[in-house]
Regions:
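Central antiparallel beta-sheet cores of small beta-barrel/beta-sandwich binding domains
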Residues: 28-137
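N-terminal secretory signal peptides that target proteins for export/translocation
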Residues: 1-8
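Bacterial N-terminal signal peptides
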Residues: 11-22
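Sec/Tat signal peptide C-region and signal peptidase I cleavage site
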Residues: 23-27
């Protein structure tokens, strides 16, 4: 093969590699629930609490934490229904007075086809019932 032929082959290979890179990037997104979710929960429009939820699909189950850091609350159990993309998870954490109580969160994912999809529904901490809305970052 002459120099011109070798250069054309190299150019074709480079073009193929760079044209396939976006396909690999899209394929790496993973499970629709996996990722960092940021938003708030609370009772009414003025009593809101900022919340960060980290969710991960392990291939067998959804795991995660609420408000990661030194006082993170691990999610004990989580289920997702792919027919309507509803999610339920439970945890054990402190209420407003610091007493350990059950946390129960139920929501439905919106904008499934977008990267910054939202999850919204009910957020219960002990006897306190509220709502939440979080967006994947």
């Amino acid at each position: 093969m002459n120099k011109r032929g070798t250069a054309l082959v190299r150019a074709a290979i480079v073009w193929m590699v760079f044209s396939l890179v976006p396909l690999f990037a899209v394929a790496q997104e993973g499970h629709p629930m996996s990722g960092s979710w940021v938003g708030d929960w609370g009772v009414g429009a003025t009593n809101r609490n900022r919340v960060v939820v980290i969710l991960e699909w392990t291939g067998a189950e959804i795991t995660g934490v609420i408000n990661p850091g030194p006082n993170a609350i691990p999610i004990k159990s989580a289920t997702v229904d792919p027919s309507d993309w509803s999610l339920q998870f439970e945890a054990q954490g402190p209420d407003a007075q610091g007493k350990m109580v059950a946390w129960k969160v139920e929501g439905t994912i919106d904008d499934l086809g977008t990267y910054n999809r939202t999850l919204a529904g009910s957020w219960n901490v002990g006897n306190t019932q509220g709502d939440f809305s979080i967006t994947r970052q």
